[in-house]
Amino acid sequence: MIQKCPQCGAVLPADDSCQHRFDQCMALEFENPTVFGAVHHLTVACYMLQHNGYSRDVWLEARNMVAQFVHDGVMPAEMRRRGRSRLDSGHRTWSMSKGAKLAEFAAIVWSRTIADIRLDNPEIYCHDVTQWAMSILSDTEWLPK
Ligand SMILES: [Zn+2]
């Protein structure tokens, strides 16, 4: 038996789910913060973007943040210095999911999902997460900045 995620379209066995995959990623990242955790800022944003976990404004802001990480090579510490701390998981003092969601979400076709992330070793993992982030940017190029 297989099932398709209603949000990102990932095809997974019936006893697996995107949430379960995400929990596995988080466990690896927290156990190995310097290796697997090197892409933590991307993993969380990618998962939330693909599962429509943010309100519209935060969704667009999070995608812009991913673009700065991936295309401009901005590091998470630098991003925090720029005052984008409301997307930093340590500073969630206001709701990031409250309010109108991205109306265009259902029209996005995702070319990669969390089901494509291999957990074999840190090199493969970080590579796959980075590819995932890049695919999210190109899959949503038509949306407003
Ligand atoms: Zn999913």
Where are these regions (language model features)?
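Intrinsically disordered, low-complexity linkers and terminal regions
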Residues: M1-K145
